[in-house]
Design a protein with these regions (language model features):
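Cysteine-cluster motifs in flexible loop/terminal segments that predominantly coordinate metals
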Residues: 28-64, 83-84
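Residues forming anionic-ligand binding surfaces in small-molecule and nucleic-acid pockets
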Residues: 43-46, 102-121
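Internal alpha/beta scaffold segment
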Residues: 114-157, 162-163, 184-212, 219
């Protein structure tokens, strides 16, 4: 299929020339379908807090607080596409009001009433195609939607992850393929579940990369049962690429950034702050996208990367990424430790020049903050790269690091990972002070 040559839907937010924004999309090797910025589901759907056609759709309200905190007019914010950026989507399966058939979408704001959103301007066109294919199967086989009030019904959620064999950013590949996961209201895989999966695969053809099942019969709002994954068809794992093109693999239940354009830009910028030949530790690593990105940057020539992650479920994907590294030298430089970051903070900061932290929304644990601000901290550690998805917790952590006198904030910028929401990712660099709190650990 020849990609259609269509103009990207790019919005220039306040104070940013449209020409500057256009350069972002010009780097892409593929194209995506043009879509209208206005969304018919807004404001009922809870996915966005700002209309996509608003002038400030790419300036989340929290950005004003970010700029005020840093007090620096030079604070830079990366804004990518306003539409078609989402390459991973989880849609609830509930009953269509008129027919009772399966409908897919997000919940209306402040409720658990479904707003059908199978067409969504922020989602990759493949997400819409996967939703339509899944619904066709549900209609043909009489699949019943989950009913929260009774706990009955078969299908609870559908997850779609877009994966491109060609592009670094799947959002720029109209021919990206879909990995579809079905969350069934059951605790055992049945032949019917398999028939539903295989019907989706048959209808989707080459478009469907793989189909998996998650068995979740708990009466709760938790979407996935992390012990309930079953691979049924095709490829089990998906992947994103590092800026160098190296594949980093993900399981269906792995945490994965939904906006590969913005995440890829973060990965491209981080190496600027890593000295050549560094020993790197990545805490809260997940499957290791940041660490593997630094490892495969030939200009950095990092000596080692240690990945620290609390969940053992990442090991299978991490090992596949390691095994596909291009040579034994790179493979020998990586290691994975399954442990809570705060439990091994002291040992992790020894023989470490650069510490990467990408914590959950709550930020760094108090005990980890104590280690990083204690005068006995290993003299090896000279740089902290902090990726934050929760600005309030970042402010607390940054204030403590700087107040200790041991760390200086030397760089800060932000990234809009979720356009039209009140969410911002902050990337900050802290350098070790040379005159306070330096003590050689023997």
């Amino acid at each position: 299929m020849t990609p259609r040559r269509l103009i990207l839907d790019v919005v220039a937010p306040r104070g940013v020339p449209s020409t500057a924004r256009a350069s972002t999309s010009a780097r892409a090797s593929c194209v995506v379908s043009a879509v209208p910025r206005a969304c018919p589901h807004f404001p009922a759907c809870s996915g966005c807090v700002t209309a996509l056609d608003a002038v400030d759709a790419l300036d989340p309200p929290v950005l004003e607080a970010v700029r005020e905190y840093f007090g620096d007019d030079a604070h830079e914010t990366f804004r990518g596409r306003a539409t078609r950026w989402r390459c991973k989507a989880k849609l609830a399966a509930r009953a269509e009001t008129s027919s009772g058939r399966v409908a897919l979408g997000l919940f209306k704001r402040g409720t658990h009433e479904l707003a059908p959103t199978e067409t969504c301007p922020v989602s990759h066109v493949g997400v819409e195609r996967a939703a339509a294919t899944t619904r066709a199967t549900c209609d043909a086989l009489g699949v019943t939607p989950y009913d929260e009030s009774t706990g009955e019904g078969e299908l609870r959620y559908v997850q779609t992850v877009m994966c491109s064999d060609e592009a670094v950013d799947p959002g720029m590949d109209e021919d990206a393929r879909a990995a579809i996961s079905l969350v069934f209201n059951a605790n055992t895989l049945t032949r019917r579940h398999e028939e539903i999966c295989m019907d989706i695969a048959r209808r989707g053809g080459d478009f469907v990369r793989g189909v998996s099942v998650n068995l979740q019969d708990a009466r709760s709002n938790v979407i996935f049962n992390h012990a309930g994954w079953v691979h049924v068809y095709g490829e089990y794992m998906t992947f994103l690429r590092t800026p160098s093109g190296q594949r980093v693999y993900y399981l269906p239940g792995s945490f994965m950034q939904a906006n590969p354009e913005a995440y890829g830009e973060l990965l491209r910028r981080m190496p600027r702050h890593v000295p050549r030949g560094s020993r790197v530790v990545e805490m809260f690593s997940g499957v290791g996208a940041i660490g593997f990105s630094l490892l495969t940057n030939v200009e950095l020539d990092v000596r080692s990367v240690r990945f620290v992650e609390s969940s053992s479920s990442v090991a299978e994907a991490w090992e596949r990424t390691r095994d596909e590294l291009p040579n034994d030298s790179l493979k020998s430089r990586v290691s994975l430790q399954i442990a809570k970051a705060e439990k091994i903070a002291v040992e992790s900061t020894r023989d470490c020049d650069v510490l990467v932290v990408d914590p959950p929304r709550k930020g760094l644990d108090e005990s980890l903050r104590r280690v990083l601000t204690d005068s006995t901290l290993s003299d090896d550690l000279a740089t902290i790269l902090y990726v934050s998805c929760g600005f309030d917790s970042f402010k607390r952590d940054a204030d403590e690091l700087v107040a200790s006198g041991m760390w200086t904030l030397t760089h800060h910028e932000s990234f809009v990972f979720f356009p039209a929401t009140n969410h911002i990712e902050v990337f900050a660099v802290f350098k070790r002070s040379k005159t306070i709190g330096r003590k050689r650990n023997g």
